[in-house]
Amino acid sequence: MTELASPTSFSMPDIGKSPVVLTARRLMRHRSFRIGLVLLLIVVLAAVLAPWITNGKPNATSVRMRFQPPGLEHLFGTDNFGRDLWTRVLYGAQVSLWIGLTVAVLSAILGAIIGIAAAWYRRFDTLLMRVMDALMAFPAILLAIGISAALGPHLSSVIIALTSAYIPRCARIVRASALVLRETDYVDAARLAGASDLRIITRHILPNCLAPLLVTLTFVFAYAILAEATLSFLGIGTPPPHASWGSIVAQGRDYSVDAWWIMLFPGIAITISALAINLIGDGLRDVLDPRLKMEG
């Protein structure tokens, strides 16, 4: 007799496992996600351990130690003020990662609120989306430069500028998902059962928008790190005395031939961080995005 194929696509050991556990397992089997996670953990650990694995003084100057090349005493060399670049790059990681994560989380939260409001309350849709379209008409970095220049060089200004630039992207992603979800049978059933708008949104709409929003958040995280470095390079980003990868690169551009290490090491840190987060985002997109699953 012909053996009937099982209608289920999961293996027996997976029965009883929570969706979170199953998703985590699929992510850990994804090569890009694993590589990105390892790289990001290295950067994060270096930033967290900076007070213990450096001299702890990113702004300490020494005229005698100016332009020292990389060596045992100064792993990344010193800059034009004699400051230890190993220390400054690791402390710069704290600033860049914190700003990038803050911008990503704020953009996701505010974008989700705007996107769901536009999709659920259709009378606000045109107004909210026209505002988002107006913001998206400008390249994100140009919008951030304009806002940051207007507000002045402060950490809060950088966060406000970058968040304003990336909110529209999150809002449009959430709105697109919410428009589909509001027409589903289980949402109609919740309406007929007398559920309030807030309950439907928090129980049925928002949870099902989290997957695409999480993917977008990771890419915004990477973009924000690059944008913060750009703003600091231009002198309108993270202000002194805070160490920032972009400002370190800017300080080394006049010495790029004789003291190449000043620009090299923060540039490598920016590249590794952005690459790691993008690899994590690729893994999340492949595992969580149902459209890509169907295409595959």
Swiss-Prot record:
Positions of the ABC transmembrane type-1 domain: 97-281
Stated family: Belongs to the binding-protein-dependent transport system permease family.
GO cellular component, one term: plasma membrane
TM segment ranges: 35-55, 97-117, 131-151, 205-225, 229-249, 260-280
Entry keyword set: Cell inner membrane, Cell membrane, Membrane, Transmembrane, Transmembrane helix, Transport
Subcellular location: Cell inner membrane
Gene3D superfamilies per UniProt: MetI-like (1.10.3720.10)
Protein's job: Probably part of an ABC transporter complex that could be involved in peptide import. Probably responsible for the translocation of the substrate across the membrane.
Chief location category: membrane
Membrane topology (UniProt): Multi-pass membrane protein
A Pfam match: BPD_transp_1
Subunit relationships: The complex is composed of two ATP-binding proteins (BAB2_1052 and BAB2_1053), two transmembrane proteins (BAB2_1050 and BAB2_1051) and a solute-binding protein (BAB2_1049).
Alphabetical list of SUPFAM superfamilies matching this protein: MetI-like
GO biological process, one term: transmembrane transport
Protein name: Putative peptide transport system permease protein BAB2_1051
